[in-house]
């Protein structure tokens, strides 16, 4: 088309288009009227655009031809230069070779002249070597020239490809231009149509009668305009018809062939979400894996290190376990290691069944009346005392409770001890707590010395004790074993000296030593909260010397030793190995059994204590969440279970533990004891408020409520109980639980009547004439009708008469008329059994 356009052609070409149509319209009178409508369209085409396009295309072709010519010239030039260089190099080498040949020929000629043409083999060899060198040099020059020519050709090819891409882009621009010009023409046609429609719509009444046809036309034209505008815009930015970009503009990323397995660093505790984040997987994947392992978890649940390691290894990751207590190890490891060890006194724990005379024996040894001070003569917590012998030797005694509730306290006593003295009553023999004490001693690896107590009683039988202990692998020396049996009487003091000698002999065999001058370490035997002095801990020093002013790290607590007292309440400035002391100055009440260690830096001690608290909280939370999930379905199936809420306050930590454990063991399937709060020290207003909120009873063990707490307790009518003996506490809690049990109902037969005759009454139906053979027949009690000792009806009486009078009851041996409600099939020989439902109280 562009080639046919001549140079003298007009710049613009206008085309007129005229069409005539007839439109019939209805007038107001109902007659149809025909109107002649002439439509004129004018289109102008600019011819110079085609000329510009032709000129542009010609310029592009010329530029392309020029580039191709330049490329060929460059290739030819590079080839000629390479050939020229190779020829020049070859000529140079040839001239050099000829020159060398001429030089070598001169002496050869003179030699021939002088020696009658003698041929030298060395010269022949040199000639061959020179020829070889020349050939190699020519080969290298030729290869170099070929390489240069190849590079020049590649570069020319790259330029040609770049030119081709430029030509393609210019042709795309040209097609875009054609496309846009086509859209411009369509837009002009649309504008003409819109002007015609505007001219037609002058008569508004007629437009209204058409029912909105023009509105639809205008809507359609508007949609078309928007569509055209969008298409034009998309064409400009290289998009397709549906608005999506072409594939040439899209970036594609290849999916990795396999998942990258990273190293996972796991601390002591971690949540499921954190573990998923570290492994770059979804949390649901971890939950699925743990469900396969039999564990139900949530996304925010804390799991321990071992579980997290199993999950990570299951998913194919390498696990790095991180030890979070590095600071703790560093602080505890900073000790005096080169200090000299010396012989120390033995720590002896006296264990045995309740009321077998442990405290009385220790009392006689200490020469002080302690047993009278204990409530009911029962030891409620560990007492620690040290006794000095006549020869200057010292023994430290720990007195543990014998009651079943104090198992954990006995276990602590056995762990802190060197020798266990097992007290067995000669008249009572081996009892449950005796067996338990033997097990604790074996678990702690402490040797036993058996004290057979109460030998002064007439019914005492020490031989029976030895026989019974044989069944529990406690073999006396008499039977070839290594356990010393010493008969004693705590009341009269018989055999006590022999017992002390046996203890010292056993300690010499053990060769007990400890560092005396280093930093102290020990174990908390007992702890409590004193109202005036604050937290008090009874610490048994095991190595080193504990001095006043030392910084002590004790479980979750820390502090400076402000004051120390011995078992008699006397102030002391230091305590060496095997000496028990009461320590004041800790930040809180430590748990009995915690290790007490002297450290150098108070700041680091605080950091370690806070770290331990946080770790304990996380582990406790993880355990609670696990228990909640595990018990969820069982709790749903159990339904409502009665709960007895209790708040426990005691004088020492060990007693709190023992009472809470004993109360939890009292729980049954119907009534559960829930300890909502426990602590060491007096009963405060906070405890009373908690009891009000949780509807709990407050149990005080060797403690009392202060004035503010008493006011709240009286105002809210809270049940407050004080105890000093654990037997009474447990029995009363059992009674309270029994009151919460659902009552049982029992049926008791109170009377029996035999049917002798049956009368028919028009109003009451069948009336049984009966003789009361047993008990009393009562009018308002339920009855059963028996025939041949088989119950055939159960209901109630409608009437009970004696002669013509209505009566409430008829006694044994009397006749009466009985009408059974809703039952008329009474026969002679039947028995009418009268019973009552009695409530039976249950107990635990």
From Swiss-Prot:
The family this protein is said to belong to: Belongs to the TRAFAC class translation factor GTPase superfamily. Classic translation factor GTPase family. IF-2 subfamily.
G1: annotated segments: 352-359
Claim: Protein biosynthesis is one of the keywords in the record: yes
Name recorded for this polypeptide: Translation initiation factor IF-2
Listed InterPro entries: EF-G-like_DII, EFTu-like_2, IF2_assoc_dom_bac, IF2_II, IF2_N, P-loop_NTPase, Small_GTP-bd, T_Tr_GTP-bd_dom
Domain tr-type G residues, every copy: 343-513
Organism encoding this protein: Haemophilus influenzae (strain 86-028NP)
PANTHER family in alphabetical order: TR-TYPE G DOMAIN-CONTAINING PROTEIN, TRANSLATION INITIATION FACTOR IF-2-RELATED
Source species, domain of life: Bacteria
